[in-house]
From Swiss-Prot:
SASP are degraded in the first minutes of spore germination and provide amino acids for both new protein synthesis and metabolism. It comes from Priestia megaterium (Bacillus megaterium). GO terms for molecular function: double-stranded DNA binding. This is Small, acid-soluble spore protein C3. One of its GO terms (biological process) is DNA topological change.
């Protein structure tokens, strides 16, 4: 199945890659094709969780003007 996720902000891919490796390092996971899907998935899940928290904090802060 083709990947249809499009990044809307130019340059964000580099940021996300760096974020991914930082979180993997925190978890003690070495990312790569030889790593278990469960380990790689835990990193992806944590990225999503943190990005959602940051977005919620940003939105709640911007609406309290």
């Amino acid at each position: 199945m083709a990947r249809t996720n499009k990044l809307l902000t130019p340059g964000v891919e580099q940021f996300l890659d760096q974020y991914k490796y930082e979180i993997a390092q925190e978890f003690g996971v070495t990312l790569g094709s030889d790593t278990a899907a469960r380990s790689n998935g835990s990193v992806g899940g944590e990225i999503t969780k943190r990005l959602v928290q940051q977005a919620q904090a940003h939105l709640s802060g911007s609406t309290q003007k």
